[in-house]
Amino acid sequence: MSWHDVLFGFDGRIGRKTFWIALVAVMAVELGCHAIAAAIEGERLTSIVSLAFSYPEFAIMAKRGHDRGMPTVIPGAFFAISVVIDFLFVIGAAGTSEEPSALLLVLTVPWLIFALALIVDLGFRPGTPGPNRWGPAPASGRPHGNGRAE
C-alpha cells in the first residue's frame, strides 16, 4: 500500500507499525502547523488546521480499524465529535481557554475517553489474523501489494 493510500484512502488494512509511523508523522506536521497558526491568528486558525488534518488521521484510523475488524463508523464517530469541537472554536462558540463553554466541556470528556480507547485498541492490539472483509492481513515488515514494506 502506498503512503498516499495510507493517508488518503479508506480501503484495505494497515498493521500497527504503519499505523504508528503514519499517525505520528501526520500529528508532527499538524503540531508544526498549529504552532504557526497560533502565532498568526490563535485558536480559530488552529482549529481550521485541525479540521484539515482530520481527513488523513481518519483514513489512518479507519484502515487500522479494518485490520482489527472494526467498522469505519467507529473511528468516524470519533472524528465527528472532533469536527464539532473544532467547529465550535472556528465559529467562536467554544468560549475561551480560561472559560470554556458548557457545550465544549460536555463534548470534550467523552472525546478524551473515546480517544484513549481508540489509541489502545488500534495502537496496541493485534489485527485479525488472515483475510477479513476489508482485505488480506497486512504483511508486517515484508513487501506488501506494491513491493513496499508494510
What do these predicted ranges mean?
Residues 72-78:
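Pore- or pathway-lining transmembrane helices of multi-pass membrane proteins that form conduits
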Residues 1-29, 57-72, 120-150:
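Membrane-interface extramembranous regions at the lipid-water interface
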Residues 29-56, 78-115, 150:
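Membrane-helix interface segments in multi-pass membrane proteins
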